């Protein structure tokens, strides 16, 4: 849209989306789940499976998972390379320590041990470097969220120190072949 000589981009307009008791800001230039009811169930499931006081949210997007811990006495690290997503993440999850970087590059330079790592990679899945870093950091639990069962299966097979203990599918797009899968991974004993 144009207003006089100045371009007025719809992409920069934010909308507030309430999921459960959390208010998120999103825009048309970023991804946000459209099925709020099932998203709320998935977020509750993720939150109830987090362990410890320190959490890393890799591929954090607009802070969907980081925002679960607003106001709690936890240390949250959010890593996202997309600038617009990170701007919204800082608003949605103000208590998270946010980093604008590629997850593998950030992990090599600044990664650290945390209790739980939440990963929600794009459809292409995790970089092998990220899997290696996760095993190096040795978190107590990894929560892997995937929208692509093929890359999720591939990624899970590449872990040598972790194994899935529980897998739950959320049909966020009823009537289509697209689902979100949450895999809980624990260290092998």
What would you call each of these model-derived segments?
Residues 1-189:
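Rossmann-like S-adenosyl-L-methionine
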């Amino acid at each position: 849209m144009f207003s006089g000589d100045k371009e007025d981009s719809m992409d920069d307009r934010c909308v507030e989306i309430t999921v459960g008791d959390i208010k998120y800001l999103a825009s048309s230039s970023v991804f946000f789940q459209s099925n709020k009811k099932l998203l709320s169930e998935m977020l509750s499931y993720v939150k109830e499976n987090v362990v410890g006081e320190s959490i890393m949210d890799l591929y954090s997007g607009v802070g969907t998972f980081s925002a679960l811990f607003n106001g709690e006495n936890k240390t949250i690290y959010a890593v996202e390379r997309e600038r617009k997503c990170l701007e919204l993440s800082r608003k949605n999850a103000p208590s998270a320590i946010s980093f604008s970087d590629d997850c593998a590059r950030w992990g090599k330079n600044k990664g650290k041990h945390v209790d739980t790592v939440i990963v929600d990679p794009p459809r292409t899945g995790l970089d092998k470097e990220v899997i290696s870093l996760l095993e190096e950091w040795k978190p107590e639990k990894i929560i892997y969220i995937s929208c692509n069962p093929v890359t999720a299966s591939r990624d899970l097979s590449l872990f040598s120190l972790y194994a899935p203990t529980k897998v739950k599918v959320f049909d966020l797009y009823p009537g289509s072949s697209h689902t979100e899968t949450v895999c809980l991974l624990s260290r092998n004993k």
